[in-house]
Amino acid sequence: MHESYIRIGKILKTQGNRGAVRVLPLTDYPERFKNMSRVQVSLKGFRTFFTVGEVYHHKNFIIIKFKEIESMAAAEKLKGAFLEVGRDELVPLPEDRFYIFDIIGLKVYDTGGRNLGRVTDVLQTGANDVYVVDTGGKPLLIPALKQVVKSVNLTEGKMVVELPEGLEEL
């Protein structure tokens, strides 16, 4: 899946009375907000850029004061909006690591070349991610482990896996 814009946060509500907003980070790299000078805000199909002023962490949230927003009433209108960045603004990942939105939609093959289906979701379990593959029947749950996932080719849109014995019967 190759989106033009990637969601990195969601504005939940206002924070204080000076027009700051409370953002739920939708990224594994919440520290990125401190280095941003501007961000695209998307709400109900409309997108606009805002200049990032103050940024600080509060519990599990990011508090952002946009320079263009001067009141709590103006900030209230942004409630429910998403903060987005372009693909070129993503944090570079280490080799053999992928963004979830790039994994979803990949065709999955076993090492023998048999088409197992397409990745429809990624479950984040804590220990390791699990790829949900639509097989046309019962979903196949594939652990995202190096010994299982043999290759991922985003250009070709495919993943090759070596399924542990008995996994397909679960």
UniProtKB/Swiss-Prot annotation:
<dbReference type="GO" id="GO:0006364">
    <property type="term" value="P:rRNA processing"/>
</dbReference>
<dbReference type="GO" id="GO:0005737">
    <property type="term" value="C:cytoplasm"/>
</dbReference>
<dbReference type="Pfam" id="PF01782">
    <property type="entry name" value="RimM"/>
</dbReference>
<dbReference type="InterPro" id="IPR009000">
    <property type="entry name" value="Transl_B-barrel_sf"/>
</dbReference>
<comment type="function">
    <text>An accessory protein needed during the final step in the assembly of 30S ribosomal subunit, possibly for assembly of the head region. Essential for efficient processing of 16S rRNA. May be needed both before and after RbfA during the maturation of 16S rRNA. It has affinity for free ribosomal 30S subunits but not for 70S ribosomes.</text>
</comment>
<keyword id="KW-0698">rRNA processing</keyword>
<comment type="subunit">
    <text>Binds ribosomal protein uS19.</text>
</comment>
<keyword id="KW-0143">Chaperone</keyword>
<dbReference type="InterPro" id="IPR011033">
    <property type="entry name" value="PRC_barrel-like_sf"/>
</dbReference>
<dbReference type="InterPro" id="IPR002676">
    <property type="entry name" value="RimM_N"/>
</dbReference>
<dbReference type="GO" id="GO:0042274">
    <property type="term" value="P:ribosomal small subunit biogenesis"/>
</dbReference>
<dbReference type="InterPro" id="IPR036976">
    <property type="entry name" value="RimM_N_sf"/>
</dbReference>
<comment type="similarity">
    <text>Belongs to the RimM family.</text>
</comment>
<protein>
    <recommendedName>
        <fullName>Ribosome maturation factor RimM</fullName>
    </recommendedName>
</protein>
<dbReference type="GO" id="GO:0005840">
    <property type="term" value="C:ribosome"/>
</dbReference>
<keyword id="KW-0690">Ribosome biogenesis</keyword>
<dbReference type="Pfam" id="PF24986">
    <property type="entry name" value="PRC_RimM"/>
</dbReference>
<dbReference type="GO" id="GO:0043022">
    <property type="term" value="F:ribosome binding"/>
</dbReference>
<dbReference type="InterPro" id="IPR056792">
    <property type="entry name" value="PRC_RimM"/>
</dbReference>
<feature type="domain" description="PRC barrel">
    <location>
        <begin position="95"/>
        <end position="167"/>
    </location>
</feature>
<dbReference type="InterPro" id="IPR011961">
    <property type="entry name" value="RimM"/>
</dbReference>
<keyword id="KW-0963">Cytoplasm</keyword>
